[in-house]
C-alpha cells in the first residue's frame, strides 16, 4: 500500500509549471471571536486569500453566536470536529461544559450549519480532517501520557492512522498543538494548532501546569505549493 500511495502523490499536486498556491488553515476556534478576528487580519496582511477550517468552531466560554455568524458569512470549506458534533448529537443535560454553556446562544440556523460539516474534505489536492481520517476525537501525531501531557507518536503509529489516503499534504487539528510530521514516503501531516484555545491552566494535575502550547497566542498554518512541492509554515 505504501508504494501505491507514494506513486499517487505526484498526481495530486498542482500540475501547472511554476504553479504557486497558498492556503491558510485554521482550527479549534472554540467560539473565541477576538482570536478569530486577529487571525483573519493576519492572514489578510500576508496576502493569503484561501482559508480552510478544520473544525471545533463554537464550543467554549467566549462568543459562540458571533463566531458562528462571522464564519457563516465567510463560507469556508470546513470539516466537523468532535465539539461541533457534540452541540447537536445529544441532549443539553448530557453535554459537557464546553457545549452546555453556549448551546442556548445558538439559533437553529447555527445548528443546521454545524450539521452540514462533513467529517473529511479534499481541497486542491489536500486532505482535511479534524483529528484523524476515521475519528473526530482521536489524537493523531501524539498521545496522552501521564497527567494528560502529550507525547509524540512514532512514525509507524502515525502512518497506521493514514489508511489509503494518498494526498501529499494532510491537515488536522484537535490537540491544539502545532506540529508538522513528514512520513518516509514523502507525505506530510500538519497539525495547525488552535486559534481560540491554545493553552489553559489545568489544576486537576499535581503539580498544575499549562496544557497545550503553554502560550496564549493564537496559532494557525499557511501551506504553499511551489513548483509542485508543498511547504508548511506554522504561524
Residue ranges and their predicted role:
Residues 1-20:
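N-terminal amphipathic/basic-hydrophobic helices that include classical n-h-c signal peptides
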Residues 14, 22-115:
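Core catalytic region of metal-dependent phosphoesterases/phosphodiesterases
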Residues 18, 182-235:
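Acidic, His/Gly-rich catalytic cores of divalent-metal-dependent hydrolytic chemistry
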Residues 22-30, 125-132, 189-192:
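Active-site-proximal beta-strand elements of phosphoester/diester hydrolases
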Residues 30-35, 59-62, 84-89, 134-136, ...:
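Active-site environment of divalent metal-dependent phosphoester hydrolases
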Residues 44-47, 106-181:
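His/acidic metal-ligating clusters that form di-metal
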Residues 50, 137, 143-148, 191-204:
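Metallo-beta-lactamase
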Amino acid at each position: 500500500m505504501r508504494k501505491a500511495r507514494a506513486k499517487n502523490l505526484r498526481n495530486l499536486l498542482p500540475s501547472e509549471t511554476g504553479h504557486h498556491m497558498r492556503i491558510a488553515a485554521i482550527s479549534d476556534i472554540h467560539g473565541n471571536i477576538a482570536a478569530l478576528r486577529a487571525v483573519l487580519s493576519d492572514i489578510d496582511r500576508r496576502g493569503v486569500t484561501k482559508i480552510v477550517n478544520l473544525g471545533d468552531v463554537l464550543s467554549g466560554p467566549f462568543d459562540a453566536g458571533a463566531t458562528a455568524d462571522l464564519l457563516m458569512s465567510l463560507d469556508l470549506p470546513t470539516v466537523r470536529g468532535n465539539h461541533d458534533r457534540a452541540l447537536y448529537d445529544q441532549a443539553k443535560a448530557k453535554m459537557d461544559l464546553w457545549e452546555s454553556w453556549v448551546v442556548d446562544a445558538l439559533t437553529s440556523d447555527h445548528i443546521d450549519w454545524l450539521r452540514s460539516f462533513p467529517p473529511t474534505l479534499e481541497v486542491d489536492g489536500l486532505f482535511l480532517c479534524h483529528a484523524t481520517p476515521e475519528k473526530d476525537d482521536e489524537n493523531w501525531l501524539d498521545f496522552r501520557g501521564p497527567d494528560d501531557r502529550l507525547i509524540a507518536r512514532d512514525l509507524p503509529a502515525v502512518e497506521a492512522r493514514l489508511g489509503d489516503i494518498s494526498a501529499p499534504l494532510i491537515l488536522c487539528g484537535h490537540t491544539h498543538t502545532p506540529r508538522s510530521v513528514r512520513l518516509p514516503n514523502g507525505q506530510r501531516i500538519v497539525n495547525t494548532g488552535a486559534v481560540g484555545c491554545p493553552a489553559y491552566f489545568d489544576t486537576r494535575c499535581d503539580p498544575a501546569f499549562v496544557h497545550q502550547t503553554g502560550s496564549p497566542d493564537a496559532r494557525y498554518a499557511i501551506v504553499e505549493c511551489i513548483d509542485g512541492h508543498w511547504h508548511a509554515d506554522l504561524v
